[in-house]
């Protein structure tokens, strides 16, 4: 859920308005879409909402090897950061995915996103950076960005 920041009240309310009217709900016939079966997810989601680079896929394979193929990558977007909004990543159990979350299957990993932020993250790309400075997942090509912070995790959105 997006957190309220008083300094970004207008943008936050606009984002909620956009999210409220463009939210994606899978049909009731897609009950298996939220099951813990990776094969069901693969069949239901042929067009991924988010792309993953090979580095990101390989990192998730490495993580799932360690955790016996039980983890999914959760992407969150919330109000905050230097530029207005920020994204973060966490690992969640595949069998604890909630109905308010959307599953995106891409090759050998599962990415989970709150349904509220699908339009913000649609057509973006998750990458994994592994260098001397940091080891982390990042998101590239987020649509409608008006500005970005040098930290790479914070951005502002143009509300159309």
From Swiss-Prot:
InterPro entries: FeS_biogenesis (IPR000361), FeS_cluster_insertion (IPR016092), HesB-like_dom_sf (IPR035903). One of its GO terms (molecular function) is 4 iron, 4 sulfur cluster binding. It comes from the Eukaryota. SUPFAM superfamilies: HesB-like domain. The keyword Mitochondrion applies. The keyword 4Fe-4S applies. Its main location: mitochondrion. Keywords: 4Fe-4S, Iron, Iron-sulfur, Metal-binding, Mitochondrion. Tetramer. This is Iron-sulfur assembly protein IscA1. It comes from Plasmodium falciparum (isolate 3D7).
């Amino acid at each position: 859920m997006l957190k309220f920041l008083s300094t970004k009240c207008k943008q936050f309310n606009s984002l909620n308005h956009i999210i409220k009217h463009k939210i994606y709900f899978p049909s009731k016939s897609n009950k298996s879409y939220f099951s813990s079966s990776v094969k069901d997810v693969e069949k239901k989601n042929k067009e991924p909402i988010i792309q993953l680079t090979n580095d990101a896929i390989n990192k998730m394979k490495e993580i799932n090897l360690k955790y016996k193929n039980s983890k999914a990558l959760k992407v969150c977007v919330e109000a905050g950061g230097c530029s207005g909004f920020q994204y973060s990543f966490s690992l969640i159990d595949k069998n604890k995915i909630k109905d308010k979350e959307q599953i995106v299957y891409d090759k050998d990993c599962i990415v989970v996103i709150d349904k509220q932020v699908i339009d913000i993250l649609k057509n973006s790309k998750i990458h994994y950076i592994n260098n001397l400075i940091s080891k982390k997942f990042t998101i590239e090509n987020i649509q409608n960005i008006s500005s970005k912070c040098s930290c790479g995790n914070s951005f502002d959105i143009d509300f159309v």
